[in-house]
Amino acid sequence: MVKSFQGVRMAEPKKAPIPQILVKEYMSTNLITFKPDDTIDQVMEVFSKRKISGAPVVDASGALIGIISEVDCLKEIIKGKYTNTPKFPGKVSEHMTTDVITLSPDLSIFDAASQFLEHKIRRFPVMKDGRLLGQISLSDIIRAFPTLRQTTW
């Protein structure tokens, strides 16, 4: 009795998973933060010296409560023009954004890039288990580009 011969079969090569490039690989972890009682004067001085455009606002326990940006500071500058104030005594708590969107450190850079496009903002705090781990900016995503070009998508 002869059994049918099916011939030589090649084993299908397993496709290697596409390596994920994650937010945690490109986020900044050495953050400059502000307190709600800091003045806009103080914020603008730090922004200018450190060449940054925004930073997280944290409470006494280090919990994220908002974001302060150059745009937020403009509100105080404009107010100062009308009151003829050379200093900007307004508090961070009066101008910060409190409805903060955060990203996970385990989110892919591609998904993070989509969030930048969707929300039209320049930075996201990175949080895990309610703890502020860092921040990722639009320029961090751009910095990841050479690595992104080497992946197959």
Provide a role label for each language-model segment:
Residues 1-153:
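Tandem CBS (Cystathionine beta-synthase) repeat/Bateman regulatory domains
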